[in-house]
């Protein structure tokens, strides 16, 4: 979790930094490793990259930053998040708990946005064991799941519309 690239960082909100070696290549006896780094929301990429650069240089390598996309995060105590959770709670009868993940999201490309989608505890997988999970082959949901999600989205949009953002 970051030690191998010189930045073993973590925070309480999003946990430890994660990174994967997505693509390796070699050209003219130069090995290139492309890393996808997901750093905790309380850190800044421009603060972490010099540390990565120095760590890689110690090993005789060179680090090049292709691009940096800041994490997408909105605290749970904001009116927007409270509104989304209230819609979830109303439809499901359960207490929704927000969480952060290291994954990329479309919400990074919009001001004042978060990724929001219901995950219903205990709802059976209509595709069977090992299939149909989010972002996996044969991703699927039941009509009941989709209708429940639609109700949450409608109530969420009405609630967000009533906020003065």
What residues fall within each predicted segment?
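A short beta-alpha structural unit
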Residues: 20-25, 34-41, 62-81, 87-89, ...
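Flexible, glycine/charged-enriched surface loops at secondary-structure junctions
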Residues: 2-13, 60-66, 164-165
